[in-house]
Structure formats: structure tokens, C-alpha cells
């Protein structure tokens, strides 16, 4: 473990991860309060905790059982530091056990919405409520997810919250600044959760809200210059938000010492290559090496239908192409990557066996060892929304910074089954039409009246009102009629979702007129597609991408 440069320059909160699926949401809420924080595994050393010197500590939830598993505990240093501590779900239970309380099986497990009654006037919950009962008790609408519960509070703790099935749903030792809740304040389902976390971070822990992107640019530029000196840097430019912002930031710091390598694998969106080159060569005057490797990628993908196999082939071929180009740049000493904080967290989760792989990521993690280059990751402390904010501050156009996420393997995982050049071309055109209709259609008062959007969203484009939207190519044919003739062509599926964190997502309720126009245009303008369907699956159970 090592301290990041950002950790040394700001007040900070330490989040200890016990394996929850939503630990990243805790960090996002803290960052939204403009306070720097980092997530680290619960089994970090006492020395690391002391060196980190947090203003406060948050203990995450977990899929494990405190009642059964005596290994997942917070380091002793957490309790010796003398700083406020907030336990969430499992974090509450381990706080209870470690400080002398007891945890027991719950006869009634709680998963989903619940209403919690506040007790007393603790600093954490004072004045925070969703409604009051006729008797005047403050109530909170929260999200529960637990099978165990605290049966006996540790010495010094008082009851802070309860539900009928969980008599101790919150507890506090105000003298020591220890607070714990059985529910999850980090998820959006807990209505007052953001306010609760801000109360802990800003008021109780006393952290300064000085984590601001425009100031971060100056810090990052100075850090890059100090790291790199007069040496040269190479970066794989994909056109995605992360690599684009990383390139712009590094170019701001060292100018022509940076060379970007843009690999076209034949699976990009319509005109994506031109947009990237116009931006970085034309506007930023950065050095860009453009490699058309579409024949190589598509050749190796021929006959391959399995999604995992496709991802691995694309990742492998990217490494091969990038490596060949990098070797031509004999003066390069650094490899820059657009690694962001969720990547860092997920890598740590994999190492501690606390995370499950749903889909392989096609990153270039093996390149530094292969090429003998030092690694430069200027975005590794930032979440995606912070990366976008940084991109705007760096002067990148909004249409690039706020473009919807695009998978590393590109259209390769939006073409079901085998990838073929003609499939990719059909999909590119269908996708562009769908996105064009979303961008060109504004939400109306009628949409708001129908419940499709909020009144405050009237006048915004449906592209901005969706978190991710794209077309999928289905390698099946259906019968159609065009003019007086019979057609037998392929099917395109349209997918649009709305989400705050991409961990869960709802399918977007788009206006029928918009969907109708997109469908008609695709069928009429993309020869080879004669049917369009709309995906109405949420996440879970479906994933956002089809493969």
C-alpha cells in the first residue's frame, strides 16, 4: 500500500472495504461533498492507517456474516486514532463486535425499502428525516440489506435508530465520535443518505471541502512534470473519455513530449476516428500516430462467437499493435494510461478475492512490463464524473466529454456472435441514426405530463436524459415487406438506460414518437436491416451491454 499524491495534499476520509458491491458509492458521495477519500481493503496494516492520517473512517458493508466470519475486522489502529468512525451495515456489526457488543442471527432478514425511526438527538441524525409520525418521531426511508443484526450494543453506545424487525438499526457513542447504521446511506434509495454522509464527513469528522477539479489541474500538471522531467511519454488514445482527458492533461503538462497512438480496430462508432484526429491533431496540436489495424483485428475475430473469447482477442491484438508502434518510439520512457479510480478499486478487489469477474476488461495492463516503460496514470484518483469535470476544465468539447460510455472492444461486443466487417458497418449506421434522433429530440411538457421525465428536464435532449444508449446487431433474419417485394434481413435492437452509478439501471422510457422515427430511419436508410426492437430489460437481471 502507498499513499497517493492527492492523499498527501488534502483532508481525507479512509473507507475500508469489507467486500460490498456498493462501496464505490460511499466514495462517490464523499467526493460529491468535495472531500478527498480513498477505498482500501479492510485488512490494511495498522501502520498504513496511521500513515494515511484520515480525518474520519467509514467501514463498508459486506456479503459476509460477522456472526460467522471472524476474519473480516477493521485494523486496531482505526480505534486507536481518536477520529470519528462510521459503520455501515456489516461495518456496524464489526464495530459492535470489536468494541464489546454482540451480533446475532436475525429472525426477519431485511432486503429492500424500510422505514427507520430515529432515537435521541445525535449529531449524525439531528434534523434529518423524511417525515414524522403523529407522535412526533422522526422517520427515514432507507435501503436495508442484512441477515444479521446487532443484538447488544458495546459499552458507551446509545440507541440511534430502530425498525420493528431490527431493534438496533443505528447506534452512537458520541463521546468518541463512533456512529453506525444498519441501512445503506450511500445508495439513492436511502432518501436522506447523501445528507447523512455529508453530516459525518463535514461536521463530525471536520474534513475541509477542498477537493475541486479546477485546482486539481494545477496539482496534476505539476505532478506530471515532476514525474516525467524531460522524458517522452506514449499513450494509447481510444477516443473514449478517460484516454482523451488523460491525453489532454498530459499534453497540458509536457506538450510535444507526449505521443498518442490511435489504433483503429475496425469496431469504432461512425466517424469516430476523424473526430479524435480533428480534436487532438487539429485543436490541441498533439502528436498522434494513427494505425489502421482493422484487417488484423477482424481477421482474428473471424469465426469467433463467444463474448469472452472476443474480448480477449481484441485485448491481445491491441497489445500487439500498440507494442509494435511503441517500439518505433525509441525515446519513450513512460506509458500513460487513462486508468480511473474504479479500475484501481476493482484491481484491488480482484487481488483480495472480494470481487467477482462479470466480464473481462480489455486494458493494457501487461504493456509496462513488456516494454520496460514506467507507468503514468494521472487520473487514477478520479471517478468518471470527476474525469468529465476535469475534461471540461481542460477545454475539451462537451460532445466528447459527455459522450455515452463505449466499451473497450467497441462494436465487437455489440455484434452478437461472430464479428464481420459488413455487420459492423450496418451497426455503425444504425447506431448513428439512433444517437442522432436522441440528440435532436428535446423532452416536452407532454413527456413530463406522461411521466417520461421530470418537469425540470423539459427542453433537454433525450441523449442527455439517458445515461447510455446504443444499437445492437442481432445476427438473425426476419421477413419484411418493402415496396412490393419481400425482404429477409437482419434485426437491430435499440438499448437506452438511465442510471446514477451504472451498478443498477432502468431502461429508459423514451417517447414512442422518437422510437418510431429511429426505427423508420434505420429500416429505410440502412439496407440490410428490416426490423428494429427496443430492449426493456433493467440491470439487474440484464447487464447494460448485451455481451
UniProtKB/Swiss-Prot annotation:
Residues binding ATP: 238-244
Pathway(s) of this molecule: Purine metabolism; GMP biosynthesis; GMP from XMP (L-Gln route): step 1/1
Function, in words: Catalyzes the synthesis of GMP from XMP.
Subunit structure: Homodimer.
PANTHER family per the UniProt record, alphabetical: GMP SYNTHASE [GLUTAMINE-HYDROLYZING] (PTHR11922:SF2), GMP SYNTHASE-RELATED (PTHR11922)
Domain GMPS ATP-PPase: start-end pairs: 211-403
Keywords: ATP-binding, Glutamine amidotransferase, GMP biosynthesis, Ligase, Nucleotide-binding, Purine biosynthesis
Residue positions of the active site: 89, 184, 186
NCBIfam families registered for this protein in UniProt: guaA_Cterm (TIGR00884), guaA_Nterm (TIGR00888), PRK00074.1 (NF000848)
GO cellular component, one term: cytosol
Gene3D superfamilies in the record: 3.30.300.10, 3.40.50.880, HUPs (3.40.50.620)
InterPro entries: Class_I_gatase-like, GATASE, GMP_synth_C, GMP_synth_GATase, GMP_synthase, GMPS_ATP_PPase_dom, NAD/GMP_synthase, Rossmann-like_a/b/a_fold
HAMAP family: GMP_synthase
Domain (Glutamine amidotransferase type-1) ranges: 12-210
Signal peptide: none
Gene name of this polypeptide: guaA
Protein EC: 6.3.5.2
TM annotation in the entry: none
Enzyme class name: ligase
Catalytic activity: XMP + L-glutamine + ATP + H2O = GMP + L-glutamate + AMP + diphosphate + 2 H(+)
Record GO terms (molecular function): ATP binding; GMP synthase activity
Protein's UniProt name: GMP synthase [glutamine-hydrolyzing]
Amino acid at each position: 500500500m502507498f499513499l497517493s499524491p492527492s492523499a498527501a495534499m488534502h483532508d481525507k476520509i479512509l473507507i475500508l472495504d469489507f467486500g460490498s458491491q456498493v462501496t464505490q458509492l460511499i466514495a462517490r458521495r464523499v467526493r460529491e461533498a468535495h472531500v478527498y477519500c480513498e477505498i482500501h481493503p479492510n485488512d490494511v496494516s495498522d501502520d498504513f492507517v496511521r500513515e494515511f492520517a484520515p480525518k474520519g473512517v467509514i467501514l463498508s458493508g459486506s456479503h459476509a456474516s460477522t456472526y460467522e466470519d471472524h476474519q473480516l475486522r477493521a485494523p486496531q489502529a482505526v480505534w486507536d486514532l481518536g477520529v470519528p468512525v462510521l459503520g455501515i451495515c456489516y461495518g456496524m456489526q464489526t464495530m459492535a463486535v470489536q468494541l464489546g457488543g454482540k451480533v446475532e442471527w436475525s429472525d426477519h432478514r431485511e432486503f429492500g425499502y424500510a422505514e427507520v425511526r430515529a432515537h435521541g438527538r445525535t449529531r449524525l441524525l439531528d434534523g434529518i428525516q423524511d417525515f414524522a409520525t403523529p407522535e412526533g418521531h422522526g422517520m427515514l426511508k432507507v435501503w436495508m440489506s442484512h441477515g444479521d443484526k446487532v443484538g447488544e450494543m458495546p459499552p458507551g453506545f446509545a440507541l440511534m435508530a430502530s425498525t420493528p424487525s431490527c431493534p438496533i438499526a443505528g447506534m452512537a457513542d458520541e463521546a468518541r465520535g463512533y456512529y453506525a447504521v444498519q441501512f445503506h446511506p450511500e445508495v439513492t434509495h436511502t432518501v436522506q443518505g447523501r445528507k447523512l454522509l455529508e453530516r459525518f464527513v463535514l461536521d463530525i469528522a471536520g474534513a475541509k471541502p477542498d477537493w475541486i477539479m479546477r485546482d486539481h489541474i494545477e496539482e496534476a500538471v505539476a505532478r506530471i512534470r515532476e514525474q516525467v522531467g524531460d522524458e517522452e511519454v506514449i499513450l494509447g488514445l481510444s477516443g473514449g473519455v478517460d484516454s482523451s482527458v488523460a491525453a489532454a492533461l498530459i499534453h497540458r503538462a509536457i506538450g510535444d513530449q507526449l505521443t498518442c497512438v490511435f489504433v483503429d480496430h475496425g469496431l469504432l462508432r461512425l466517424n469516430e476516428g476523424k473526430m479524435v484526429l480533428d480534436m487532438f491533431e487539429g485543436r490541441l496540436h498533439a502528436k498522434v500516430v494513427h494505425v489502421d489495424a482493422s484487417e488484423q483485428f477482424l481477421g482474428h475475430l473471424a469465426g469467433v462467437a463467444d463474448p469472452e473469447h472476443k474480448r480477449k482477442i481484441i485485448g491481445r491484438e491491441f497489445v500487439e499493435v500498440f507494442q509494435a508502434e511503441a517500439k518505433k518510439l525509441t525515446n519513450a520512457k513512460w506509458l500513460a494510461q487513462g486508468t480511473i479510480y474504479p479500475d484501481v478499486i476493482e484491481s484491488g478487489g480482484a487481488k483480495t478475492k472480494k470481487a467477482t469477474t462479470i466480464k473481462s476488461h480489455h486494458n493494457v495492463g501487461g504493456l509496462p512490463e513488456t516494454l520496460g516503460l514506467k507507468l503514468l496514470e494521472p487520473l487514477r484518483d478520479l471517478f468518471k464524473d470527476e474525469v468529465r469535470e476535469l475534461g471540461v476544465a481542460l477545454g475539451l468539447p462537451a460532445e466528447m466529454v459527455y459522450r455515452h460510455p463505449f466499451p473497450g472492444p467497441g462494436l465487437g461486443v455489440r455484434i452478437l456472435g461472430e464479428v464481420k466487417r459488413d455487420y459492423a458497418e450496418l451497426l455503425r449506421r444504425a447506431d448513428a441514426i439512433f444517437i442522432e434522433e436522441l440528440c435532436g429530440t428535446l423532452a416536452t411538457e407532454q413527456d413530463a405530463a406522461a411521466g417520461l421525465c421530470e418537469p425540470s428536464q423539459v427542453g433537454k435532449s433525450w441523449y442527455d436524459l439517458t445515461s447510455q444508449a446504443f444499437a445492437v446487431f442481432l445476427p438473425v433474419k426476419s421477413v419484411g415487406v418493402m415496396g412490393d417485394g419481400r425482404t429477409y434481413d437482419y434485426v437491430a435492437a435499440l438499448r437506452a438506460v438511465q442510471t446514477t452509478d451504472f451498478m443498477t439501471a432502468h431502461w429508459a422510457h423514451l417517447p414512442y414518437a422518437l422510437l418510431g422515427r429511429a426505427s423508420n430511419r434505420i429500416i429505410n436508410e440502412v439496407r440490410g436491416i428490416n426490423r428494429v426492437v427496443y430492449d426493456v430489460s433493467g440491470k439487474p437481471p440484464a447487464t447494460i451491454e448485451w455481451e
